[in-house]
Curated annotation (Swiss-Prot):
Its cofactor is pyridoxal 5'-phosphate. It comes from Salmonella schwarzengrund (strain CVM19633). Pyridoxal 5'-phosphate binds at residues 75-76, 155, 183, 203-205, 243. [2Fe-2S] cluster binds at residue 328. The lineage of its organism: Bacteria, Pseudomonadati, Pseudomonadota, Gammaproteobacteria, Enterobacterales. The gene is iscS. Belongs to the class-V pyridoxal-phosphate-dependent aminotransferase family. NifS/IscS subfamily. Homodimer. Forms a heterotetramer with IscU, interacts with other sulfur acceptors. Pathway: Cofactor biosynthesis; iron-sulfur cluster biosynthesis. This is Cysteine desulfurase IscS. GO terms for biological process: [2Fe-2S] cluster assembly.
Length: 404
């Protein structure tokens, strides 16, 4: 077993060796390096064929028509293109958007930008377990609501929203429904031929493909229109200009192909490892599970250890690559906005750790992690005056701290 142990697969994944090997064939002179938009010679045709194959592989994993897949630079761009693109195109119908407080920043910050441009956004607060109350969603829908954006799997706590029912609700009212599926694609079954989802964002690097490539699903029947955010050569049926990065697209396609083949067995394995991890630490005093194991992705476990400062815990766990909050926001020392939205106090939110498991995680690594967490929590609490006061029965909420 090699240290440190990587348990931050929700931040990014290593590229699968099979994917890397495939990508190498699309870079150099003796490979397929052409521009897929070059229509006048074989180099371009071969590149275009490689892109077509990858587009099919991605469509097959999610039950889409390959013509509904638009390549982007990643899920952040896909979220921007979907939300801004739909809002701008349909703004004559209305200017009201609904999303949730626990969405990824790529969705929340895009909505904030649209608010500056005159749109109105309703931010739904989830229930204590992170799931959106569908009655609240229904109550928020208005005649001028044009777009709902609710993610599939939350990147911090792993809860799974009921995108099938939300899709039915939106379709019945003629509202466009966008889903950020970055954390769920290849981990949970997605069948867009059955789901009433109009726009869906995907990433390459959360599923053992390369960074810098993603896709947006744009439904054809009923046809969804979006306004391009990037202008140029009119690539990707006018929705996203820019020369297609063939090697990255091929890598994403191969990653999605592998995911389709291995998803069922891999998810059962990861669910077992996640449960093993939780069972190994759940009897520590004052430990709380954030999210919902039953309605949760099989690979994410978010846990709060009360009376332990999260950053000091991460330092103590230096042999484990884990995160507090998500990588996209961990540059700030603010407690996780996702956990705050669940109604958690700052102290508990600060003491939370996200463990996310993946394809190369082993049972041996999980057992090592359990042992290390138990020892570290014990050691840090021995040093903590708060823990001592708690053990003496002092109500810490009633204490007035002196300001020196």
């Amino acid at each position: 077993m090699k240290l440190p142990i990587y348990l931050d697969y929700s931040a990014t994944t290593p590229v699968d060796p099979r994917v890397a090997e495939k990508m190498m064939q699309f870079l150099t002179l003796d490979g397929t390096f052409g521009n897929p938009a070059s229509r006048s010679h074989r180099f371009g045709w071969q590149a275009e064929e490689a892109v077509d194959i990858a587009r099919n592989q991605i469509a097959e994993l999610v039950g889409a028509d390959p013509r509904e897949i638009v390549f982007t630079s990643g899920a952040t761009e896909s979220d921007n293109l979907a939300i801004k693109g739909a809002a701008n195109f349909y703004q004559k119908k209305g200017k009201h958007i609904i999303t949730s407080k626990t969405e990824h920043k790529a969705v929340l910050d895009t909505c904030r930008q649209l608010e500056r441009e005159g749109f109105e956004v309703t931010y739904l607060a989830p229930q204590r377990n992170g799931i959106i109350d569908l009655n609240e969603l229904e109550a928020a829908m208005r005649d001028d609501t044009i777009l709902v954006s609710i993610m599939h799997v939350n990147n911090e706590i792993g809860v799974v929203q009921d995108i099938a029912t939300i899709g039915e609700m939106c379709r019945a009212r003629g509202i466009i429904y966008h889903v950020d599926a970055t954390q769920s694609v290849g981990k949970l079954p997605i069948d867009l031929s059955q789901l009433k989802v109009d726009l869906m964002s995907f990433s390459g690097h959360k599923i053992y493909g390369p960074k810098g490539i993603g896709a947006l699903y744009v439904r054809r029947k009923p046809r969804i229109r979006i306004e391009a955010q990037m202008h140029g050569g009119g690539h990707e049926r006018g929705m996203r200009s820019g020369t297609l990065p063939v090697h990255q697209i091929v890598g994403m396609g191969e990653a999605y192909r592998i995911a389709k083949e291995e998803m069922e067995t891999e998810m059962a394995r990861l669910r077992g490892l996640r449960n093993r991890l939780w069972n190994g630490i759940k009897d520590i005093e004052e430990v709380y599970l954030n999210g919902d194991l039953e309605q949760g992705a099989p690979n994410i476990l978010n846990v709060s250890f009360n009376y332990v400062e999260g950053e000091s815990l991460i330092m103590a766990l230096k042999d484990l690559a884990v995160s507090s909050g998500s990588a996209c926001t961990s540059a700030s020392l603010e407690p996780s906005y996702v956990l705050r939205a669940l109604g958690m106090n700052d102290e508990l939110a600060h003491s939370s750790i996200r463990f996310s498991l993946g394809r190369f995680t082993t049972e041996e690594e999980i057992d090592y992690a359990i042992d290390l967490v138990r020892k570290s929590i014990g050691r840090l609490r021995d040093l903590s005056p708060l823990w001592e006061m708690y053990k003496q029965g002092v109500d810490l909420n009633s204490i007035e701290w002196a300001h020196h």
